């Protein structure tokens, strides 16, 4: 967590700043960033190299999409491994591009927010132009990584990139920017499905794909609202909109609504494509239990030995496990 902001200089406005005291930026002294050349550190910080959980968050819908498609149509394990490797590269590059774009667009807001004011563009370590060039390079490399996949993957990838570019502007005009962010990640379900030959947006699979995409979108909204609660005070002062701000007095109700909507979407998906009991046990039941546990931790401090992050990870693991079990038990494990 960054330190507090400095007092205003003489002759400046008498308005109380959002952050009253500010300590100067301190270069990293531990972790992966401390091992890099000093000139590389701002760019590594820009792509959140020291925060890999963001990569996991973006990567998991790709894997869910692969297993969703493979539970419906046979896919060799070697093909799944190849696609998973490609999407790991795509995720790393496009997540970095998204972070760089977001920080460039949000730099004025970041300077007013305690948690964000030492980000490289906000503190002046990287210029606006350098940030845009870096974003473009990462984006081009990302699309180069998926060129061996069916052309539909590129089409969906363009849509994903457009949604990602829109996201930071959404926080200025709507309280539901998290829905844009969630839709960005949800679009990767179709991307992954097309990569293994399932026509995800065709008439036969459009509704099931939509149900799973809605699930991913709602999971991202759930996670992002939990994460954004820490910035609610600063966001109210600086005028940043968001669901954590809009529903700040009704967060438990919002979480409950999201959880029920996810359970309903997954149940509908399972019915439409004929999923078996493993899917309902893990992907529906286990996921729902994980999210309910997270709400309980948030409000009533139930299960004090567990963090809310563990509950969320448990929920995601169950979602994936249900698809894996369906894939395995339907004798789709071919070409081992």
Swiss-Prot record:
- Note down the stretches annotated as region Disordered: 1-26
In its keyword annotation, does this UniProt entry include Cell division? no
Name its co-factor(s).
Mg(2+)
Question: Per its UniProt entry, which superkingdom is the organism in?
Answer: Eukaryota
Keywords assigned by UniProt, alphabetized: Magnesium, Membrane, Transferase, Transmembrane, Transmembrane helix
Q: What induces it?
A: Expression is induced on AF medium.
Q: What chemistry does it catalyse, as a reaction equation?
A: orsellinate + (2E,6E)-farnesyl diphosphate = ilicicolinate B + diphosphate
Q: Do the record's keywords include Cell membrane?
A: no
Q: What does this protein do?
A: Prenytransferase; part of the asc-1 gene cluster that mediates the biosynthesis of both ascochlorin and ascofuranone, a strong inhibitor of cyanide-insensitive alternative oxidases and a promising drug candidate against African trypanosomiasis. The first step in the pathway is performed by the non-reducing polyketide synthase ascC that produces orsellinic acid by condensing acetyl-CoA with 3 malonyl-CoA units. Orsellinic acid is then prenylated by the prenyltransferase ascA to yield ilicicolinic acid B. Ilicicolinic acid B is further reduced to ilicicolin B by the reductase ascB.
This chain belongs to the protein called: Prenytransferase ascA
Species in which this protein is naturally found: Acremonium egyptiacum
Give the lineage: Eukaryota, Fungi, Dikarya, Ascomycota, Pezizomycotina
Q: Which gene encodes it?
A: ascA
